[in-house]
Curated annotation (Swiss-Prot):
Gene3D superfamilies: ATP-grasp fold, B domain (3.30.470.20), Phosphorylase Kinase, domain 1 (3.30.200.20). Transmembrane segments: none annotated. Pathway: Purine metabolism; IMP biosynthesis via de novo pathway; 5-amino-1-(5-phospho-D-ribosyl)imidazole-4-carboxamide from 5-amino-1-(5-phospho-D-ribosyl)imidazole-4-carboxylate: step 1/2. GO terms for biological process: 'de novo' IMP biosynthetic process; cobalamin biosynthetic process. This is Phosphoribosylaminoimidazole-succinocarboxamide synthase. HAMAP family: SAICAR_synth. Its EC number is 6.3.2.6. It comes from Thermoanaerobacter pseudethanolicus (strain ATCC 33223 / 39E). GO terms for molecular function: ATP binding; phosphoribosylaminoimidazolesuccinocarboxamide synthase activity. Keywords: ATP-binding, Ligase, Nucleotide-binding, Purine biosynthesis. The keyword DNA damage does not apply. InterPro entries: SAICAR_synt/ADE2_N, SAICAR_synt_PurC, SAICAR_synth, SAICAR_synthetase, SAICAR_synthetase_CS. The lineage of its organism: Bacteria, Bacillati, Bacillota, Clostridia, Thermoanaerobacterales.
Length: 235
């Protein structure tokens, strides 16, 4: 497997082409951003933690018949993935009230929802990733009705699998965002699943173990990321 030219660099990852047309290499960075890029910084070893956590969780989902872009972890910071055409959407699941939904709906942080809440965001940095619904998605031709249904079904399945898995590690999966892509195999779960893209709370202390520690200047950011990896058996 030969790593070739840089295809794309985002806030948290670099994507490289390889000598195989349908395979890419993702390299995870230590750069951290919040509030749509308004806050920037670095979290030591974040790239290593996010790569290892994502690899563990993608492998778990693959075993549970959720198709993902993950092939294998190559090194501390790199993983091999299948080439996909990413939908310009973020699919968000909220099991508890936290973050923007508290401000938007006047909810107290920590409220457990009777059923999981699913939201879509339009991936657009200039517009600050506005929330949209399935009608916007179809009208703007971002995805078809059938594709939306597939992504929705996969998202709820991911939530069931991961919520149970994290509870077994004494972690509450508060909320998370997913991204999906199209490939010759159909729709695949893509991007990453990590403390960057999920809210994790300690089941017993309710301590935040995710990027909120960076967003809110709570301190011990690196320790929180490493704690997640440790509980998942990745250290």
């Amino acid at each position: 497997m030969e790593k070739r030219e840089l295809l794309y660099e985002g806030k948290a990852k670099k994507v490289y082409k390889t000598d195989e047309e349908n395979l890419y290499i993702i390299e995870y960075k230590d750069d951290a951003t919040a509030f749509n890029g308004l806050k920037k910084g670095t979290i030591a070893e974040k790239g290593i933690v996010n790569n290892k956590v994502s690899a563990i969780l993608f492998a778990l989902l693959d075993k549970n018949n959720v198709p993902t872009h993950y092939v294998k972890r190559l090194s501390d910071r790199e993983m091999l993935v299948k080439k996909v055409e990413i939908f310009p959407l973020e699919v968000i699941v909220r099991n508890y009230a936290a973050g923007s939904i508290c401000k938007r709906l006047g909810l107290e942080e920590g409220l457990k929802f009777k059923t999981p809440v699913l939201e879509f965001s339009y991936k657009n940095d200039e517009l600050k990733d506005p929330m949209i619904n399935e009608y916007h998605i179809q009208a703007l031709e971002l995805a078809t009705k059938e594709e939306i249904e597939i992504m929705t079904g996969m998202t709820f399945k991911v939530n069931e699998i991961l919520s149970e898995y994290f509870l077994s590690k004494d972690i509450i999966l508060v909320d998370f965002k997913l991204e999906f892509g199209k490939s010759s195999e159909g729709i695949l779960l893509a991007d990453e699943i990590s403390p960057d893209t999920c809210r994790f709370w300690d089941k017993n202390t309710m301590e935040k173990l995710d990027k909120d520690r960076f967003r809110k200047d709570l301190g011990k950011v690196e320790e929180a990321y490493l704690e997640i990896l440790k509980r998942l058996g990745g250290m």
